[in-house]
Amino acid sequence: MSQGTLFDKVWDLHTVDVLPSGQTQLFIGLHLIHEVTSPQAFTMLKDRGLNVLYPQRTVATVDHIVPTENQARPFADTLAEEMMQALEQSCQDHGITFHNIGSGKQGIVHVIAPEQGLTQPGMTIACGDSHTSTHGAFGAISFGIGTSQVRDVLASQTLALAKLKVRKVEVNGTLPAGVYAKDVILHIIRTLGVKGGVGYAYEFAGTTFEQMTMDERMTVCNMSIEGGARCGYVNPDTITFEYLKGREAAPKGADWDQAVAWWQSIRSDADAVYDDVVVFDAQDISPTVTWGITPGQGIGIDEAIPGLDHFTDADQPIASEAYKYMDLQPGQPIQGTKVDVCFIGSCTNGRISDLREAAQFAKGNQVAAGVKAFVVPGSEQVKQQAESEGLHHIFEQAGFEWREPGCSMCLAMNPDKLQGRQLSASSSNRNFKGRQGSASGRTLLMSPAMVVAAAIKGEVADVRQIPKASP
């Protein structure tokens, strides 16, 4: 059992009771909801005659089904419109804060909570979305939950959970040029596997993470779940505090000083005991691209697709399946693979720093003929900031479409979908079969900068070979 980790401290502080099952009844400090996993939960509350216990601890927005082109109401998709109306009514009925389209605060749930200062160190955070681990970048314990658990949080502000073990994932050194936070997490998942983190919370540590911005830390924590870890976090530090200071929901005045003192106290102790420790060298990480149908099937841009002998007996069947589905062969270089669609956005890489970096590679270049490329800001605030900096003009002049905020093609529960066998270069987080809207569509995951490189070349390309414009 680990001692002195942030995970242990936050877990213990939020423990209401230990249940006969051995699970912990855990108090949830912040509950985030959206239009997809909440309607049924509210219906279950109504059927049982229950109210939302602490409506002030729940914040809602719309993101999954939101169109990124024509957002006029009612939506053309009648089911999407019904889901929108259901969430609007539920929030009104229960007094829940709701950030709707046009409010200036709408966006992907895992983008808006941090940018508003709602996400803070030491919190327990739950959301009916598997990428809730994003918020761990602040030193919060955050995890995705199912619809019945959404109901439980609404009704009791608690969850019954089994405590996770803690694995320290340490990365040391300065990242090489052209290597980003997305490459770091893809490299970790490639090495530890998509099931390697099952039963664990990942504590991301080491000098590489100490140098990262909050946006970069969020990218890494976002994809903890792709590595099997339900929760991933980084200990809060001055970078965390500077990000939060002055944000709308962050503490102010004397409360701020008290908050920072407490946030520092929950950091993992120097002598904390972990259930496991793995160490990586930042210099071993290169621009990384997934080639298959799981986030663990990734390789460096200079590598070729591995043969079956590279995989364990247990992993060989899915590797064989990936070769066939992706129409790629062992020994084939990933560089030069033709792309049809290039997507920049999602809760993994739709923040302002992602767009700034991508724009520096797009500037002065042109999207290749036959390639559809588009950029979807993660929130209305991100969109407004990007436009104030003129980033939208850079993208549009390069041939990218500039869209409204939403989850977009990450999961294609909206009009943004692949068609047929199209192959997508995507800054999102999942590359499962059919993930981006077509049952036969194919997805390659990579950093936003690498997506721009692919868009310009019309094929998977090394961003290190693309000139970078001045900011």
UniProtKB/Swiss-Prot annotation:
Gene Ontology terms: biological process: L-leucine biosynthetic process
Domain of life per record: Bacteria
Disulfide bonds: none
Reactions it catalyzes: (2R,3S)-3-isopropylmalate = (2S)-2-isopropylmalate
GO molecular function: 3-isopropylmalate dehydratase activity; 4 iron, 4 sulfur cluster binding; metal ion binding
Keyword Metal-binding (UniProt): yes
Residue numbers binding [4Fe-4S] cluster: C347, C407, C410
Keyword Transcription regulation: no
Enzyme class label: lyase
Cofactor(s) the protein requires to work: [4Fe-4S] cluster
Keyword line: 4Fe-4S, Amino-acid biosynthesis, Branched-chain amino acid biosynthesis, Iron, Iron-sulfur, Leucine biosynthesis, Lyase, Metal-binding
EC code(s) of this entry: 4.2.1.33
Subunit composition and interactions: Heterodimer of LeuC and LeuD.
Family: Belongs to the aconitase/IPM isomerase family. LeuC type 1 subfamily.
Described function: Catalyzes the isomerization between 2-isopropylmalate and 3-isopropylmalate, via the formation of 2-isopropylmaleate.
HAMAP family recorded: LeuC_type1
Protein name: 3-isopropylmalate dehydratase large subunit
Species, as recorded: Acaryochloris marina (strain MBIC 11017)
